[in-house]
Amino acid sequence: AALDGEGIATVAASVLATAGLANANTPVPSQFWSRLAGNTARHIQLTLAALLLAGVVGVSLALVLQPFARAASALLYVCGLLQTIPSIALLALMIPLVGIGVVPAVIALFLYALLPIVRATLTAINAIEPVYLTVADALGMTASERRRHVLVPLAMPHIIAGLRTAAVIAIGTATLAAFIGAGGLGQPIVTGLALNDTGLI
């Protein structure tokens, strides 16, 4: 049976929540999809912001430092070192620096997303045939023009592959961002664990 289009379970949960007899943090069925949509939107925002920053910074650093072997190796080493820090520890390290919320979460996700992008860009540029660079020099291209018109277009397939890998890392790690108040799909998990509410989880 249903009441005004609502199932009995929905009506009962709403009445209990209104009366303060049920956990207000556990969404009733009518609220489930709206909360899920909100958490999903925040999760996507965190991921896209981090990927955008990592893409711009990672590709730019790789392009600038690629001619210098030691600097490029140092960049890869630092990015790899960041990957060894546990996700929750890196998020916790952000708190004394920039507080809690979206900003520290985006910074942490950005740092995690750097390695695949930098590595893919450096690998792609190093694999470019020298003849293309020779032709660019013969045409009188400046260093910036050579990067923009030769290196980036030829390296783009590898860069996109690096971005895909970074996206997988960011999407997974963004779940933990809820522990520092950034929201996202990890929010109901964190709240459910804190309240010992398996229904919410």
Language-model region placement:
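Periplasmic/extracellular loop-to-transmembrane helix junction in inner-membrane transport proteins
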Residues: 6-7, 14-52
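Alpha-helical membrane-interface segments at transmembrane helix boundaries
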Residues: 33-49, 72, 76-82, 95, ...
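Loop-to-helix entry region at the N-terminal start of transmembrane alpha-helices
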Residues: 38-47, 91-116, 200
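Transmembrane alpha-helices
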Residues: 48, 111, 143-177
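Internal alpha-helical transmembrane segments of multipass membrane proteins
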Residues: 48-64
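Cytoplasmic-entry segments and transmembrane alpha-helices of multi-pass inner-membrane transporters
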Residues: 61-94, 109, 117-127, 134
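Non-cytoplasmic
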Residues: 109, 162-201
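Short helix-to-coil transition segments within interhelical loops
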Residues: 125-131, 135-155, 182
